[in-house]
Amino acid sequence: MKKIAVSTWCTDDYAVYLRPDRLEKCINHFHPEIDFHVFGTEETENVTKDHPWLGADNVKFSDWMMVATCLPLVEDYDMVIHMDADCFCLGSLDRVIESDAELIGVRNNNFFGKAGSAQPCTSPFYEPYGSGQIGVNDFINAGFVASNDKQFWYEWRDFNKFVAEQSDGRVFNYQPWPMIRNEQDTWNHIFHAENKYTSEIIDQEGSGVTYGIINQWGDKDHCESWKKLYMKDGMVYLDHPITGEPLRTSVLHAAGVGTMETIKDYGDQYNWLYGMISEEVADHIKSIVGD
């Protein structure tokens, strides 16, 4: 059986509001075999011991921390999954776990071709990784990253380090790649690189599932769609906004939607979520986390 770890980055000052302990409960409810790791305050304070480049004056370390939080795990696990701390696990991660692809990603842009209620994310696809454009349906979100290949994490670190060191703290100076500015951009380039890794976007159109911010849409608010989540056969679903197809929804990702100021007003992000979703879905989550 595949040995799997989930990692999230959450320092103590954020943990009281984002509640990674509840994320752990939800993941272990569906997958007791998965080990959950929080890269917390102590690890963050010591990160430059192993990654001195993250402490450079010209590097905004929060744009490049993801690999550093996962690398301590890659030698001990067959699969490592990164989940942002503002994710909610509502169901099985089976599509991820069962994938044999070396890299597993989730879409950034929704069924209307937008990033929530905002404009879509796309990127030029720079050589030597590719050419042309990483388009609306292919651009992936770095809030949920999984890999069955440990070498990927080292390559991603090296790519991040190279790009970060080209910055003066404000502007990126490496002219061949002017639009690669953070780890989401580097993730997209490695994921889609030609003749490199096998890759799978698990929530593509027609997959019947959602695993991230693809399930966000609305006229004014990114997550108006979450009000339409419902329970069926003990699982959380959201209907496709165009075709009406029921989509099994395993992960919600706030992705900055609930600002920390708003979350603090609710006490934590789970109370914020409960105030937005239906009572039956809220009760489902509460039964898992013990609220």
Spans of features found by a protein language model:
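Aromatic-acidic/polar surface patches that form glycan- and anion
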Residues: 9-20, 60-62, 134-138, 145, ...
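Short, flexible, basic/aromatic active-site loop/helix in glycosyltransferases
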Residues: 122-135
